[in-house]
């Protein structure tokens, strides 16, 4: 099979894990794999892995003969020109290449990559859409709606990472998606259950893992809750793992609030190491798809305290395998954390229940399962 993966994300985050891992599985199985991605980082291990498997990787955010730094400047001055350039690059690349059996368009949200899928539709190529997030915070503009609806209707399949995301996308589009399905992301911790538990005699430790982007990830909500008197007085520390454009402002916010037991650890490549020292995950997100870090924390036997957004409630049973905040607000988060604190003697038990539960909801090798589905989809498209 000849399979093409297209990603319009200009950075590397959780939404890049599924397509890249699946592409590696297909390439290892002898399929022809081509990747079109904006902002290819040659130092990224997944990119190096795909190149080692003889996959063709093309950067949509490059202009022939123009230095990368100059093109980056042009893009920063005009995002519209950047999107237009990516469309042209993809259009030419697909038109001049051997006709693919399937194109997989991966987008970080549920409509931010629609213009890339539109290229496939215009070229009459069989394609599938993968959406990694849908949120009430982001609705397509009316002028986009006609094209977005067209690319979803024409897709061979529309994949989402949670049932919530599928349902919300149908609401935003105004029609059902009969060829929609939920897929799982690959995770970066061991499938084998952990039996260790960090020392909890002097204090409890929570990790808040993710991109430092309060609009979506809600770290500001957590800082305000931790600034409340009772949390200041408790033997609880919180470490923020991850980087982002708002790291400095969040650090300043924590300093201004006088939060002495809050630490910013930056990006950590060894995810499993996080859970060697932390007792639980606190995720105050305002929007999500299916947080990879939530799956990883549960696989690691750590207690999750999360807001009821995205697919969180699809894997966390409140009070049994974790704690759900009813909404992404300070009071709701405080209430969920308070319930968790009152049952802190049960955290290891809750973590064990979470570990058992999540293994019934996700496959051991999500990328292999997705690769199989894509081959079946490509085969059916080829037969038409």
Please name every model-derived segment.
Residues 154-180, 189:
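A short, active-site helix/loop in glycosyltransferases that binds the activated sugar's phosphate group
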Residues 318-319, 323-330, 339-344:
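Conserved acidic donor-binding segment of nucleotide-sugar-dependent glycosyltransferases
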Residues 303-306, 316:
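Short hydrophobic beta-strand element within catalytic cores of glycosyltransferases
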Residues 251-268:
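Nucleotide-activated donor-binding/catalytic signature segment of Leloir-type glycosyltransferases, i.e.
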Residues 108, 267, 286:
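Aromatic "clamp/platform" in nucleotide-sugar-dependent glycosyltransferases that forms part
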Residues 4, 198-217, 223-226:
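Conserved donor-binding/catalytic core segment of Leloir-type glycosyltransferases
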Residues 102, 276-289, 302:
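Acidic donor-binding loop of glycosyltransferase active sites
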Residues 108-111, 127-142, 157:
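A short, histidine- and acid-enriched strand-loop-helix "catalytic/donor-clamping" loop
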């Amino acid at each position: 099979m000849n399979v093409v993966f297209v990603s319009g994300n200009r950075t590397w985050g959780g939404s890049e894990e599924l397509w890249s891992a699946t592409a590696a599985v297909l390439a290892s199985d002898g399929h022809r794999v081509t990747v079109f991605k904006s902002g290819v980082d040659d130092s990224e291990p997944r990119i190096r892995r795909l190149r080692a498997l003889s996959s063709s990787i093309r950067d949509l955010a490059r202009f022939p003969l123009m230095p990368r730094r100059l093109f980056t400047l042009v893009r920063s001055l005009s995002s519209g020109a950047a999107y237009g350039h990516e469309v042209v690059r993809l259009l030419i690349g697909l038109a001049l290449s051997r006709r693919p059996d399937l194109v997989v368009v991966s987008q970080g949200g549920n409509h931010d990559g629609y213009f890339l899928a539109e290229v496939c539709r215009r070229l009459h190529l069989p394609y599938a859409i993968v959406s990694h997030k849908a949120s009430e915070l982001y609705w397509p503009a009316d002028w986009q709606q006609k094209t977005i609806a067209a690319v979803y209707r024409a897709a061979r399949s529309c994949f989402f990472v949670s049932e919530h995301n599928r349902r919300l996308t149908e609401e935003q589009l105004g029609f059902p998606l009969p060829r929609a399905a939920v897929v799982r992301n690959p995770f970066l911790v061991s499938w084998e259950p952990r039996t260790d538990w960090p020392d909890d005699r002097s204090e409890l430790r929570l990790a808040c893992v993710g991109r430092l982007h309060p609009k979506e990830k809600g770290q500001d909500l957590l800082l305000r809750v931790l600034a409340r008197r009772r949390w200041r007085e408790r033997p609880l520390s919180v470490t923020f793992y991850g980087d982002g454009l708002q790291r400095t402002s969040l650090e300043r916010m924590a300093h201004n609030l006088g939060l002495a037991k809050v630490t910013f650890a930056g990006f950590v490549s060894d995810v499993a190491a996080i859970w060697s020292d932390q007792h639980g995950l606190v995720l105050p997100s305002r929007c999500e798809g299916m947080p990879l870090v939530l799956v990883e924390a549960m696989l690691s036997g750590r207690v999750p305290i999360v807001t009821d957004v995205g697919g969180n409630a699809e894997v966390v049973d409140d009070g049994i395998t974790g704690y759900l905040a009813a909404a992404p607000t300070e009071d709701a988060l405080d209430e969920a954390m308070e319930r968790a604190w009152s049952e802190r003697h049960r955290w290891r038990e809750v973590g064990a229940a979470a570990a058992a539960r999540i293994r019934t909801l996700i496959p051991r090798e999500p990328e292999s399962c997705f690769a199989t589905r894509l081959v079946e989809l490509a085969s059916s498209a080829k037969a038409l």
